[in-house]
Amino acid sequence: MKFTEFSRSQWRVLLILMLVNFANYVDRQIIFSLFPSIRHDFDLTYVQLGYLATAFTVVLSLSTFPLGMLADRISRRTVIGAGVLFWSCATFFSGWAGSFRSLLTARSLVGVGEAAYTPAGAAVISASFPPQIRARVQGVFDIGMFVGGATGIALGGVMAQSFGWRPAFFLVGIPGLLLGLSALRLPEPPASLSRERMPVRELLRVPAFLALLVSGWFSSFAGYAYVAWGPELVQDYKGFSAREAGLALALAVVLGGTCGIATGAYLSDLLAKLRSWGRAVIIPVGFVLGAPAIYFSLHAASKLGFLFFFGLGAFFLSWYHGPLTATIHDLVPPRGHASALGFYYLFVNLFSMAIAPVVIGRIADHYNLITALHVPILAQLAGAAFFLVVIYCIRRNGLHHPVLARHWNDEPCTAFVPAVALTVEGS
């Protein structure tokens, strides 16, 4: 199936959810470009800045799994729309924070809203398109994440220097309200075509999924460390102003990341046609190739050299986005797609992303930020090693592990109108 063969309903689902993902990551990442201004206003340490990111991530992590389970049981449209409206309001009110504590509270509430979106949105995408192109459509969905994150970083830098950090939160909160209302108008999905639920304890008996969790722990630690401390790195060590820092990082991430998402998703779907484990191969390859690029970016002597190597690192590291979600959904029956992805994000966010900003901040306080950012390079290599275990488990047991066999025998759960999911209208 080609992109030109998508029905109008499929394009509508993909476009709206990609735009919501864009807004999701604008709201999520904009704070990192605002760190220097917030630190100056509230007289904070690096560790306190790390706590701002960690509080958001802890709440996001704890909320993702139960909201993912909820999305497998009720209307995914309602879960998505309510989450978007909630996080947009919390982002807007972040601009009114009068103290470090009130800003910490507001950012934590943003985490609740955003936790509702990713598992439900990704489950809807997988249910709306054939498995043969699963990595590519998930890649399109994730392009919203990359472009949104880069836009948040760039916009934050420009707004902080021109107007201050508070108007930045006001500006990005409003569009999310409109997108939340649009999400509520998507076709109403059935929660599931089966009354029986897939217990998570059964999923935890699948070796490939367990190895995937460990790999995700390391790779998420690395990715979040780069995102959290990238703006501080380029301003304190690479000679960029606040405005230049946001724009420069956005350019490197958008060009490298979006090209990497497209490349990784295409290669993943291509390799999936050859072997059951083929889709997963692209992930550790990207992690390994990205490590030297990030290392050279840290030690680049010029701005141009930094941007080249950082963009190259973003290219390779972003190979995993589409294939990761596609691999999880390949391993899990449709009725458990949102729950499985929610549990994955609970684990990797709570136990890696939540601690990454603080760990790197503490090392930076004792040594320096460049030294601290060597730690995530080692973490991404560890993530690659554990994903080789995922591949081994798939080769040994297949994609459909015997533990979950009874759940695969039911009719697949489609997230939206049955005519939209799995087939092209008129085919």
Spans of features found by a protein language model:
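Helix-breaking motifs and short loop linkers at transmembrane-helix boundaries and internal kinks
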Residues: 43, 75, 96-102, 130, ...
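Helix-loop-helix hairpin linking two adjacent transmembrane segments in secondary transporters
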Residues: 141-184
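Extracytoplasmic gate region of multi-pass secondary transporters
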Residues: 31-32, 207-261, 321, 325, ...
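Juxtamembrane intracellular "pre-TM" segments in multi-pass secondary transporters
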Residues: 2-6, 188-213, 237, 411
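Structural signature of the two symmetry-related core transmembrane helices
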Residues: 78-92, 279-294
